[in-house]
């Protein structure tokens, strides 16, 4: 993020330029619908985004947090990183495919889980006209929230596909892509040696050693 953005008033964006924050700032300034959708979602965390005009084409991207008004450069890196994902999600048109790589980076566990709700909101934002998301993630929190929302009926298992990529077993082999069937109640089989197994092991060992020390 930058402290100042020079905006071209003639630009009309439907896809963000990932190399420059100008298009993000332009969309948030000019597109009331997208800005309101973004702020509805950020409002869950007590945040609001706004664009202030300093001089003609010079603008600042501001984050309002409770009683504080902060430049985008002064908030946590996770917020500045996820903001383009939120904007592009709501900006994308029906039938489009948006690809997101590891959106959970620099986000705490609760917000990682809330990403699942964001993505559900995005695909539903065009009513019956679907948007498509391809998300590469290592976040167990995101997957567990998604599983919960399927069980609660907020999204159908038919609308979700989960693939796990296994590393090659030797230098001559290729990575293996495994599709995991998602049941109507949201359950699916975790792959071997994934986080769930480690969490279970760590919890079991923690409890065992607590009792040993008594």
Feature-to-residue mapping (PLM):
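Coupling/switch segment of ABC-type P-loop NTPase heads
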Residues: 1-41, 203, 207
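Switch/communication elements of ASCE P-loop NTPase nucleotide-binding domains
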Residues: 30-204
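Conserved helicase/translocase motor-coupling segment
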Residues: 211-214
């Amino acid at each position: 993020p930058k402290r100042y953005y020079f905006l071209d008033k003639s630009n009309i964006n439907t896809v963000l330029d990932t190399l420059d924050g100008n298009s993000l700032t332009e969309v948030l300034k000019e597109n009331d619908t997208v800005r309101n959708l973004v702020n509805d979602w950020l409002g869950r965390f007590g945040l609001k985004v706004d664009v202030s005009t300093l001089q003609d084409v010079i603008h600042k991207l501001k984050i309002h947090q409770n009683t504080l008004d902060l430049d985008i450069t002064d908030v946590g890196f996770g917020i500045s990183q996820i903001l383009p994902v939120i904007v592009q999600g709501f900006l994308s048109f029906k039938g489009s495919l948006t690809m997101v790589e590891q959106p959970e980076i620099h986000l705490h566990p609760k917000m990682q889980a809330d990403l699942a709700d964001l993505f559900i909101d995005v695909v539903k934002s065009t009513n019956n006209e679907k948007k498509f998301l391809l998300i590469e993630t290592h976040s167990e929190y995101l997957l567990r929230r998604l599983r919960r929302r399927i069980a609660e009926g907020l999204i159908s298992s038919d609308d979700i596909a989960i693939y796990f990529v296994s590393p090659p077993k030797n230098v001559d082999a290729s990575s293996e892509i495994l599709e995991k069937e998602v049941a109507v109640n949201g359950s699916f089989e975790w792959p071997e040696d994934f986080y769930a197994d480690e969490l279970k092991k760590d919890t079991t060992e923690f409890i065992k050693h607590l009792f040993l020390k008594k």
